[in-house]
Amino acid sequence: MKLTVTLPTHSYDLTIETGALDKIGTWVRSLWQPQRVAIITDETVNKLYGAAVEKELQAAGFETSLIAVAAGEQSKSLETAQLLYDFLAEQQLTRSDGLIALGGGVVGDLAGFVASTYMRGIHFLQVPTTLLAQVDSSIGGKTAVNTKKAKNLVGTFAQPDGVLIDPNTLKTLEPRRVREGIAEIVKSAAIADVELWHRLSSLENEQDLVAHAEEIITACCKIKRDVVEEDELDLGLRLILNFGHTIGHALENTAGYGVIAHGEGVSLGMIQITQVAEQQGLSPLGTTQELVTMLEKFHLPVTTDRWSEERLYQAITHDKKTRGGQIKIIVLEKIGQAKIVSLPTEEIRAFLNREGGI
């Protein structure tokens, strides 16, 4: 399956194909003429796919270099970015060369950020190997690193030249990482595709979803593609993709990056904000329970004891969606349809402190 992301200044294809990683050299050659390619990956993915990917690229005539960062959210930092800048400079990569992000969401965000800022921008490709990255973070051009203050606080918009998605990589993914991706899939269905929601309802568990991965990934990529085409720079409609993310990011930040996985934070965030939305009359009664039922089926968390009102308030008010004393909150009008509401930041405390918090 091939989907095209069509934007005013740059368009590119999403290639979704089981076994596609085995033909990565041919794919890259169809997109690029540069002879030198740097691969950024993490230590876990490198052990699984690094050598094979380099071999395929070299067979296609590319000169390759590879660097593997530590696996995990802690690598998504300015300090790691500096190490990567130094590596690219040592390899004498220029703006006529290219970079490949091979890995999950952390690698994709980090490598995309580095590619967009090294020498004021070099060409790059996304090759996501986790379910979360395949259905969400590899598409749309958002790149970022974290700081101590907030997740994704420093970043750019930079579109790749292409995205290669091979569902076979899910076979080597540990169950917790599969569930992370499922949280983003549930989010996508909840905000924009009731038919996908019904399809997810028909699946028995995580294993059943992975067995239908190409179908599910394609559906999510279509949602992301359509939203990004309408709002590339996150000024309006694209904000709906952040459903559950404001509180989710805050939970990740306050717990310490890596303690609560991104998908787990999103799961908790969707429940929390929907409980609030029901109380405010913004979402129909029973919507929270529909989410709980779906998320629990896939063994995603819906409650947590990691709830510090003050630290969460500080993290939320540093969120990128806070502008002019207002924060944009995404709520469900119904399953399959989201809307954006503005909330004064001073009201966040009342939300966090309400009776029955998560």
From Swiss-Prot:
InterPro entries, sorted: Dehydroquinate_synthase (IPR050071), DHQ_synth_AroB (IPR016037), DHQ_synth_fam (IPR030963), DHQS/DOIS_N (IPR030960), DHQS_C (IPR056179)
Gene Ontology CC terms: cytoplasm
Keywords: Amino-acid biosynthesis, Aromatic amino acid biosynthesis, Cobalt, Cytoplasm, Lyase, Metal-binding, NAD, Nucleotide-binding, Zinc
Pfam families the UniProt entry points to: DHQ_synthase, DHQS_C
Catalysed reaction equations from the record: 7-phospho-2-dehydro-3-deoxy-D-arabino-heptonate = 3-dehydroquinate + phosphate
Keyword hit for Transferase: no
An annotated GO BP: chorismate biosynthetic process
Pathway annotation: Metabolic intermediate biosynthesis; chorismate biosynthesis; chorismate from D-erythrose 4-phosphate and phosphoenolpyruvate: step 2/7
Free-text cofactor note: Binds 1 divalent metal cation per subunit. Can use either Co(2+) or Zn(2+).
Role summary: Catalyzes the conversion of 3-deoxy-D-arabino-heptulosonate 7-phosphate (DAHP) to dehydroquinate (DHQ).
Protein name according to UniProt: 3-dehydroquinate synthase
Organism, as annotated: Enterococcus faecalis (strain ATCC 47077 / OG1RF)
